Regions:
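N-terminal topogenic module of multi-pass integral membrane proteins
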Residues: 1-46, 197
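A glycine-rich, hydrophobic loop/mini-helix early in the fold
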Residues: 43-92
């Protein structure tokens, strides 16, 4: 198999096995993104880097889906992190929806690398590269938005739960129509399959709690940073 086939084959095999070196490398990159996002979030070049990386990743991935007429059960953007990629990248300005998906994208990226569930293709297939670089770009774009434009008044806990349950209800319907496993609502990892309705409730509750926790951690960090700034000026 030549390099072109490795990149773009439609023949599913099995997902790559991630070893210790991979985990060390990925989490080093994640730490670097957290640090640089905090330090360079106001730099246009830094913002553009992650925006361009995300755009290229999405164009290549969905171009590959389209050219190869991949089934709707796999090729629609209804995975949580992919929805976040589109919203954080394309939605302009400050809004509760962009903020919600930036919080989701921050947690989702960490979860995706702690417990990776990539597509069944060999490395460096476009789907595997998209999984890696797409999530890294999502984290960068999400952190830049949250560190620059976060507004705690936009999203309270109740709204987070309502938005998550509403979003997953949409994904639930898409899965019924396409036979897919978007949002891992059909076969949730870790907890296993407990039936469609129970899966929906479990995933929605867990995701709502995770986004809420991410929100609280961010607010605590921003509060501490504000106190440091006040102390410096005093």
């Amino acid at each position: 198999m030549n390099l072109w086939d490795i990149f773009f084959t439609t023949q599913a095999t099995e997902p790559p096995k991630f070893d210790l070196f991979w985990y060390v490398s990925i989490f080093t990159l994640l730490a670097l993104i957290f640090y640089t996002a905090y330090r360079y979030r106001e730099k246009k070049a830094y913002q553009r880097f992650f925006q361009i990386l995300q755009a290229v990743q999405l164009i290549l991935l969905y171009g590959w889906y389209g050219v190869n007429h991949m089934p709707l059960s796999e090729s629609l953007p209804f995975y949580h992190c992919r929805m976040a990629m589109f919203v954080v990248l394309l939605l302009p300005g400050q809004s509760k929806y962009r903020q919600y998906f930036a919080l989701l994208g921050t947690f989702g990226t960490l979860a995706a690398f702690v417990y990776p569930v990539p597509d069944p293709y060999p490395f460096p297939h476009i789907a595997i590269l998209s999984f890696i670089f797409g999530h890294l770009a999502l984290l960068g774009n999400s952190l830049v938005y949250l560190l620059r434009q976060y507004d705690a008044r936009m999203l309270d806990v109740k709204r987070i739960f309502l938005m998550t349950f509403g979003l997953n209800a949409l994904i639930f319907v898409v899965n019924l129509v396409t036979g897919g496993d978007y949002g891992f609502l059909t076969k949730p990892p870790l907890v296993g399959d407990h039936g469609l309705v129970a899966n929906y409730l479990i995933v929605s509750l867990a995701l709502s709690a995770a986004i809420t926790l991410t929100k609280k951690i961010l607010e605590l960090f921003l509060e501490q940073e504000a106190e440091k700034m006040i102390a410096k000026k005093a």
